[in-house]
Structure formats: structure tokens, C-alpha cells
Regions:
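Elongated, amphipathic alpha-helical interaction scaffolds
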Residues: 1-214
């Protein structure tokens, strides 16, 4: 397996990488379900990553154009959910807002689909499919940015118990236990990234190891 070259952007490379269902199921099983085999490739279907929508505010529509890196519909016990992976190399100090807007756009799209169906099916009922967004961070530094919306706010003590929050599931690939991955391509990717960053900090690391030319 080849990692990104100077002609290939890492985000684009990883986007295509996790488009494969077996890889997606394996990484999500590790980061979301403690390595339990909750998902399998047969329980997944790739979804449209276009999150573009229009928000109406007091008759002043605001268009929002964005694309997810990877979006998959999963089935767990016959119940559907949407899981998105966003690949992040740099620390983004606005990422809770970004993922909040992405998820809100997904719910908005589901609501619009319901309204469209309601026009010809009066029996249609609104039942939202839950959405989970996982951010795979593979930057050199330890993540120092906010993880929730509340991390970005200063609140009066009286409001801290009633303010809605939005958690961003940020996973630092440098901290993953690659041995728990069952997909070989995933193990090669995560171990390769971890070795790369360890090599940057310790030149003796690679001297003690014979590296494949592939």
C-alpha cells in the first residue's frame, strides 16, 4: 500500500481509502465500539457526501455548500444510522462548529426528503436517522483544539447545566492500538503513520528496523 505522495493530498488519499467498506467497518469498530465486530462490510452502504442545503432565516435564505469525506449508512440490529469520517491533518480550532453544521445539514436534508414525500404520501412520518461524525486526526502535534461547542464558549455558571452541547469525536491515529485492527490495509496505514511520526522524533527508530521498499 502506498501512502500519499507530494502529488497526492493526504485528505484525498484517505477519503478514497475508507471508501472501501471492509476498511470503514474495521476502523469504526475500533474507534466507536472498542474493537467489537458491530459492523461488517455487508451492513454498510455508501451515501451521497453532498451536504449542500439552504437555511431560511427570516425570509433570507443562506446557502451552505460542503462535502463530507466519507458518509456511510450502517445497520445495527436492523436499525439504521449514518456514520461520517472526516480526515484532518491540521488542528482546526473551529471543528466543533464544522461538524455541528455538517450534522445539522444531514438532518435538514432528511427533513426536506420527508416534506417531499409528504406531498404524495399523506401517511409519511418523520423519523430521523441518527448521525455520528468521527474525525480522524493524523497531524504531527497532539490535538490542542476544542472538542465540543462548550469548549469554545464562556458561560455563566448558572447556564452550564442547561446549555446544549455538541461533541466532536476526535480520534488521534497516533494513539490507536493498530494491533486491534483486523483489516491488514488499516493496520499498514495506521502503523505507517505512527512510525512516520516516531521517526521524525527519533532517528534511531528506523535504524533498528528493516523497512520494505514497497
Amino acid at each position: 500500500m502506498r501512502l500519499a505522495t507530494p502529488l497526492l493530498k493526504p485528505d484525498a488519499t484517505l477519503k478514497n481509502f475508507f471508501h472501501y467498506k471492509s476498511r470503514f467497518a474495521d476502523i469504526i469498530n475500533l474507534v466507536c465500539f472498542d474493537g467489537q465486530p458491530i459492523l461488517s462490510r455487508n451492513s454498510l452502504s455508501n451515501e451521497d457526501t453532498d451536504m449542500s442545503t439552504v437555511f431560511d432565516f427570516d425570509e433570507h435564505p443562506i446557502s451552505f455548500n460542503a462535502y463530507r469525506d466519507t458518509l456511510v449508512k450502517v445497520s445495527v440490529g436492523g436499525i439504521y444510522a449514518l456514520i461520517a469520517i472526516e480526515n484532518q491533518k491540521a488542528i482546526d480550532y473551529h471543528i466543533p462548529v464544522r461538524t455541528f453544521v455538517y450534522d445539522a445539514s444531514s438532518y435538514k436534508k432528511q427533513y426536506q426528503d420527508y416534506l417531499d414525500e409528504k406531498k404524495w404520501n399523506k401517511e409519511a412520518k418523520l423519523k430521523l436517522i441518527p448521525i455520528i461524525t468521527v474525525v480522524l486526526y493524523y497531524g504531527e502535534r497532539k490535538w490542542s483544539g476544542p472538542r465540543t461547542l462548550l469548549d469554545m464558549m464562556e458561560l455563566p455558571e448558572e447556564m452550564k447545566g442547561i446549555m446544549n452541547d455538541w461533541n466532536t469525536h476526535i480520534i488521534d491515529v497516533k494513539e490507536l492500538d493498530a494491533s486491534l485492527l483486523t483489516d491488514k490495509d488499516n493496520r499498514d496505514l495506521i502503523e505507517g503513520l505512527q512510525m512516520f511520526y516516531k521517526w521524525q522524533g527519533d532517528l534511531e527508530f528506523f535504524k533498528e528496523r528493516k523497512m520494505s521498499r514497497d
